[in-house]
UniProtKB/Swiss-Prot annotation:
Family: Belongs to the bacterial CoaD family.
Reaction equations catalysed: (R)-4'-phosphopantetheine + ATP + H(+) = 3'-dephospho-CoA + diphosphate
Name of the molecule in the record: Phosphopantetheine adenylyltransferase
Binding site for substrate: 10, 42, 74, 88
UniProt function note: Reversibly transfers an adenylyl group from ATP to 4'-phosphopantetheine, yielding dephospho-CoA (dPCoA) and pyrophosphate.
Residue(s) at site: Transition state stabilizer: 18
Obligatory cofactor(s): Mg(2+)
InterPro entries per the UniProt record, alphabetical: Cyt_trans-like, PPAT, Rossmann-like_a/b/a_fold
Pathway: Cofactor biosynthesis; coenzyme A biosynthesis; CoA from (R)-pantothenate: step 4/5
Self-association and partners: Homohexamer.
Species name: Shewanella sp. (strain ANA-3)
UniProtKB keywords: ATP-binding, Coenzyme A biosynthesis, Cytoplasm, Magnesium, Nucleotide-binding, Nucleotidyltransferase, Transferase
Binding-site positions, ATP: 10-11, 18, 89-91, 99, 124-130
Organismal lineage: Bacteria, Pseudomonadati, Pseudomonadota, Gammaproteobacteria, Alteromonadales
Gene3D superfamilies the UniProt entry points to: HUPs
Amino acid sequence: MHTRAIYPGTFDPITNGHADLIERAAKLFKHVIIGIAANPSKQPRFTLEERVELVNRVTAHLDNVEVVGFSGLLVDFAKEQRASVLVRGLRAVSDFEYEFQLANMNRRLSPDLESVFLTPAEENSFISSTLVKEVALHGGDVSQFVHPEVASALTAKLNLAKA
């Protein structure tokens, strides 16, 4: 069993699809680090600190999960965290090409870092942070796609933006 795995992402916000993959990764690996990327090029709705806090709340019941914000190259972060595995989610065939390129680049930069792909449960296969934000922005109910604390935080964030 590989001891330490990283599940990286922007998590803006964390969805039920992300949470499902985190729970399954926590069963597969001794220690899972949720690496939350600063990623300013994506112009996240939530700050890095807010995203770390939300992911901490959603994963609080998992003893072997740690949430850490980072910036810079993922392979450097993985090395700092002494992780040997990257966990990535594949929702659809359309995700595969990008993830395949990413896995090969990461392997070239850090040959000892292995990528493992997990697919979401069917009920989560269409959920993305972008879609959740879009639904919420137009007043739709996102409670079936995100943890209740995330739904509340998203509503509060959008109400502040409208004010």
